């Protein structure tokens, strides 16, 4: 399964060798250029040393911790990586809950639910949360903990399902355009979904379900991955 996992990852993420949750934030991404260069040279130890150290009160603290966990994963420090990822996940859940309270109560701040004021208003994107769980699942795979890996892909898929619901209006709008004569509806819908869902994560969960002999669930997630990345020949061969 490891071989299929790596082949699929390369094909699905070609051109994205430095895929990281922090890529969505240009200012922080700029700071990470030396880190990425070290990673591209397969010098993970150097990358870990070059990673900026942000205090808990820094606005980029959680992003920094995500990158810390990713580098621990690349360094095959799986146990430590999972601890760091889990800590970030728990902090993100607090922030998401605080955001809901702010929205429903119209509050400017909810200090009791946040670890520090500087992160008020920051709600992690679905793509960030999805990749967090994907990295954790991969760490468990390499430690031969299939059940724990399945827990993480279920978490990831829950994030993706919620993102789909949140963006249903956009999908409906694009479907209407497709009905008016757009040449390739599958490609259009896939492009829209790619903005908030992740084909690789669906592919990963498909692999893990297949390894657990949950073949129907595996096929469903392979199809979801293909819907997002309809031109990927590897996914086409997997589904057909």
Please annotate each region the language model reported:
Residues 16-37:
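Bacterial Sec signal peptide processing site at the extreme N-terminus
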Residues 25-26, 59, 126-127, 189, ...:
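Residue signature of alpha-solenoid helical repeat architecture, marking inter-repeat boundaries
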Residues 29, 33, 67, 71-74, ...:
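"A position-specific structural signal for the A-helix of alpha-solenoid helical repeats
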Residues 33-72:
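Post-signal-peptide N-terminal segment of Sec-exported extracytoplasmic proteins
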Residues 51-52, 85-86, 92, 153, ...:
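Inward-facing hydrophobic residues that define packing positions of alpha-helical scaffold repeats
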Residues 60-63, 91-104, 160-172, 226-240:
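Boundary/linker segments of alpha-helical solenoid repeat arrays
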């Amino acid at each position: 399964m490891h071989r299929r996992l790596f082949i699929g990852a390369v094909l699905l993420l070609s051109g994205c060798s430095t895929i990281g949750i922090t890529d969505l934030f240009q200012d922080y991404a700029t700071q990470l250029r030396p880190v990425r260069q070290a990673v591209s040279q397969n010098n993970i130890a150097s990358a870990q040393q070059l990673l900026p150290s942000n205090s808990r009160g820094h606005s980029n603290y959680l992003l920094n911790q995500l990158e810390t966990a990713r580098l621990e994963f690349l360094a095959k420090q799986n146990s430590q990586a999972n601890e760091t990822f889990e800590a970030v996940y728990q902090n993100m859940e607090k922030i998401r809950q605080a955001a809901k309270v702010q929205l429903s109560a119209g509050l400017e701040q909810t200090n009791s639910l946040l670890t520090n004021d500087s992160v008020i208003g920051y709600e992690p994107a679905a793509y960030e949360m999805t990749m967090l769980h994907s990295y954790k699942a991969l760490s468990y795979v390499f430690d031969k903990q299939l059940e724990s890996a399945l827990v993480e892909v279920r978490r990831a898929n829950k994030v993706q399902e919620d993102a789909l619901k949140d963006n249903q209006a956009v999908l409906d709008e694009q479907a209407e355009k497709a009905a008016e004569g757009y040449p390739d509806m599958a490609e259009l819908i896939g492009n829209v979904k790619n903005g908030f869902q992740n084909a690789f994560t669906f592919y990963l969960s498909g692999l893990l379900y297949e390894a657990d002999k949950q073949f129907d669930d595996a096929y469903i997630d392979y199809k979801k991955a293909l819907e997002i990345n309809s031109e990927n020949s590897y996914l086409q061969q997997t589904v057909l």
